[in-house]
Regions:
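Extended, compositionally biased flexible segments
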Residues: 1-101
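Catalytic-pocket segment enriched in acidic/His residues
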Residues: 2-21, 36-45, 112-199
Length: 199
């Protein structure tokens, strides 16, 4: 059966060495860094990370971030992006990493003033988290070339000034556990691994 209108192009991310990775869903995982979980009133030893979604169209590998409208307070958090090529029900933990196609560095942009307003009104945060170009992402690096990093520095600088610095080893829920919580293929899981030093 034919579409009645032309379907939109498939969102995708560039791959180091060439090619594109198609993206169907983007799951974001918060409170995955102990200090940040405590700061947000959670218990890092008990509470699993919560999930929310960004629109795949919000992914942006252009290297530019136009300041969004309707906000005077945009915050940034550097993240680890995990690209999944497979998914399914009841994936054994020991096989979870087989679902991972590659990794990238990403940034979660938040219109913090709109988020605070939504919290006060007990409304969803979507307007603060899911907006155009709210998920800058670097090029994907295949796991076949770098393996599955469990540790390693991840940093963010603004105009040359270091704003975030940490190590992947500081994540409460490791990639293998986060992969097991997600059952979709052609997805990107953006895992919070750091606390923003200036927030």
């Amino acid at each position: 059966m034919r579409y009645v209108i032309d379907p939109p192009p498939t969102p995708s991310l560039p791959v180091r060495g060439g090619g594109l990775f198609p993206v169907r869903r983007v799951y974001c995982i918060g409170r995955n860094y102990a200090a940040h979980a405590v700061e947000m009133g959670g218990d890092p030893n008990r509470e699993p990370p919560f999930f929310f979604q960004k629109n795949p169209d919000d992914l942006d590998a252009s290297g530019r971030f136009p300041y969004p409208r309707r906000s005077r307070n945009v915050h940034h958090e550097v993240e680890l992006a995990v690209a999944l090529a497979a998914g399914g029900e009841d994936i054994p933990v020991e096989r979870a990493l087989e679902c991972v196609w590659g990794y990238a560095v990403a940034i979660d942009m938040t219109r913090r003033d709109l988020q605070d307003e939504a919290k006060k009104l007990q409304r969803p945060w979507e307007i603060a988290k899911a907006f155009a170009r709210s998920a800058p992402v670097g090029e994907l690096v295949p796991a076949s070339t770098i393996g599955h990093p469990a540790r390693g520095a991840i940093t963010l600088a603004v105009d040359g000034e270091l704003r975030q610095a940490g190590d992947l080893a500081q994540m409460i829920w490791k990639v293998v556990g986060l992969t097991g919580l997600n059952r979709s293929r052609a997805s990107v899981v953006v895992a919070e691994g750091l606390r923003t030093s200036d927030q």
